[in-house]
Structures are given as C-alpha cells and as structure tokens.
Amino acid sequence: MTITTLKPETAAQAADAVRWALSAGEPLEILGSGSRRGLGRPVQAGHALDLSGLSGVVAYESEELVLTALAGTPMATIRDMLADRGQHLAFEPPAIDGDGCGEGGGTLGGLIASGLAGPRRISAGSARDHTLGIAGVSGRGEAYKGGGKVVKNVTGYDMPKLMAGSFGTLTALTEITVKVLPAPEDTATLLLFGLDDAAAVGLLDRALRSPYEVSGAAHLPAGIAARSGVAGVAGAGGAVTLVRVEGFGPSVAARVAMLREELRADAVLDRGCSLAVWREVRDAVWFGGVAAGGPHPNPPPLGGGGDSAALAPDSLPCPVGEGWGGGNRSDTPHLWKLSVPPSAGPATVAAIRRTLDVEVFYDWGGGLVWMEAPPESATAIRGALSAGGHAMLVRAPDAVRAATEVFQPLPGPLMALSRRVKDGFDPKGILNPGRMYAGL
C-alpha cells in the first residue's frame, strides 16, 4: 500500500489534517519517529500523520518538577535537558528503538501514547502517573486541552491519563506536560546467586516489603544472566536475582548494608555496573532489545562491591542495537510481555513450558514476565494466565500481528466500554484504526 505522509509543523496544521481526513473518510496512521510502529496491530491507512515536525520544549520548570514539550520532541533532547538539572523521568521508560541511552527513545508523544514503563514502575509508578496535561486533536477534528502544568493540579486529571497507553487511537497528541523528578545521586544492586524462579520471587517480595525503599526487583534465570554485559552478573555461573537501592549516597550505603545482611546477598554492584545491568533489564536486551555490547568495564568482584568511583556515570557506554524491531524476520522468535500477580509468575511460566519451549526473565518483583516464544503461541500463553493476568505480543511479523490479538482480549463489558470511549473521541474511526483491537 502506498502511504501519503502529512507532516504538520504546528498544532493548527495538525488539526486541519485531522479535519480533512474526517471529511474525506480517510483513516490516519499517527506517527512520531516511528520507533513504536511495530507495537500493536498494523494500521491499515493510506495516509500517515507525521507529528515529528511538532518539536521543541515549550516550558521546563525544574523547581516545579514539570516539563511541557511538543509531542514530536525527541526523547534524546528531553533526556539531555533533564540530565543538566539532575532530573529524569522516574518511570524509567524502555529504549525500544536501539538507543541504549535514550529515556524511552523516539518522541515524547510516542512514549506517552505507548504507556510503557521500566523497572522503577514498582516504586515510581507508570507513564500514566507522570502525565499531567495534554493537548491534541480528537477524531472529531476538535483541538482541546486536558490537565494542567503543575504537579498538584487535578483539573481534567483523568483526560491525560486516558491518553497514556491509548496508542494514538483516541487523539493525535500535539503537546504533553509530564512530571519530572530528581535523579538518584547513587545506586547499588544486591546480587543473589543460584535461586530458582519461585524462591527468587519470594525473596523479591521480602525485599519489596522491607522498609529499605527498593526501586528495582528482577530475576535472571541462568541462561539470561550468562548473556549479561556486566561481568559480575555473567560470571555468576547460574541464575542471578537483582535488588536495587537508589537515593543519596549515605542512605544507599546504609540500606544496602542492612539488606545484604537480611537477604544474605552474595555480592553488590556499584553505581556504574548497576546502571548497566538495569539498562539491560529495562530494554530486554537479551530478547532483541538494545545489544548489550560485551562485558561491562570495571566489574566488581563476585564476592563484594566495586569501586563506585571506577566509572563516571557520563562515561557509561550507550549500547546500540536494533531495538525491539526485526519482527518481520521469519527467524525471530516472538516476544511477549506478561503482567501477572507476582506470586503467580513462576507457576504461569511452568504451565507454559509444559507445551512450549520459552525463555524468560522476571521484573517488577515477578509481576512482569518477559518471554521469547515460538510462533503460534498465543493460545497456550493466554490459557496459562491466572485471573487478572494479561499478555501483550510485543514483537512478531506484521502478518502475525494483524491476525493475532496483540493485547489481552477484553471481556464483553470492557470491550463495550472501550467502544464507547473510542466513539466519544473518534466516532468515524479515523485515528490509528485497529491498532489495539480489530474493528476499534
């Protein structure tokens, strides 16, 4: 299909483009940089609305912990601006486009529309929790704003949150206001070796229930740990369980000491190696995310911590790879993201392994399972989910994503509600039609 691209340079031009599409009955594929084009179902549209021309930071009030930018602003620009003030996006968005140093990669609009969050979600919340305000154009051709530009403002509070994770099916976003937070001064990661999945998830639960403010809790089975670019993890010779602590330097040191004794940890990674291994977890590098790039320099000894000054944070390598793309290659396994009650994670994986050969690792204390699986696995994977769990097909060829429920199938009442919401914003179905569910 030949696609005609419309590239507005102002919000008014974006509104005009949507109004034209509405009057002509032409569906639009909403794009920024295109880094998340492989997420969700392929959009069947003859026209693309490229919002990358709406770029630039509108306002950055670091003292108020608020940043407003146009939707097409590259995340690399935002990352660098925040870093200059010692701030960041606390929900730790994954870099899915191969930019290992990008806070989510791509553009701000794509980041919020996809709603993805990284390991720190367990303590800092999701992308939705950090979205304060939006401006955009609905499928009715109406330009509107929702939310506010201060952290305590609750006017229109639900509208911005509705857009986070909507994958451009409700509104073509033109401007977004997000909450930013101080980046942690220091970070350290406790390592525990040789635990099976169930024991590891139980230990992570203990760590998260402790008073020590754990900000990352992941488990890497032996095959995954061996492929880490951090020598202290790859050299463990088996499974590795990770517990991260962040904050002011003295506080981190004190909490690590207490946690190490309580959990009987085998080793501690210093700041440099902690940043490296959590990038790997965040970006699912072992499953075709950003290439790990080999053992990390200055690894700590396996029996203890390392020199926290051995590697300055700005000298960390930025691993570069193909991201979560490459899904159209026939030899690429399908990538799934399973959200489950943490205690149910290992049993869910065990049930799936009765019929499928899969590879996994756990994040969010066991509540997030990253899984590489062979083709035609959807029925087995979703059949093993416990009540309340859901599975998203993150990477697969276009033809598979067009024929498979990429997101967890919704029960009848929830699907009816989703249709009413879609009809309220986009009654003619011109914005990213079918991106999340067929016919929606």
Where are these regions (language model features)?
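C-terminal substrate-binding/cap subdomain adjacent to the FAD-binding core in PCMH-type
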Residues: 113, 132-293, 327-332
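Intrinsic-disorder-associated, low-complexity terminal segments enriched in Asp/Asn/His/Tyr and depleted
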Residues: 296-298, 307, 314, 328
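Short, conserved charged micro-motifs
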Residues: 77, 197-202, 250-257, 344-351, ...
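Conserved glycine-rich FAD pyrophosphate-binding loop
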Residues: 39-45, 52, 267-293, 328-440
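N-terminal glycine-rich flavin-associated loop
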Residues: 1-28, 51-102, 112, 116-149, ...
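Glycine-biased, low-complexity coil/linker segments
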Residues: 303-305, 321-325
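Residue-level signal for inorganic ion chemistry
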Residues: 32, 243, 371
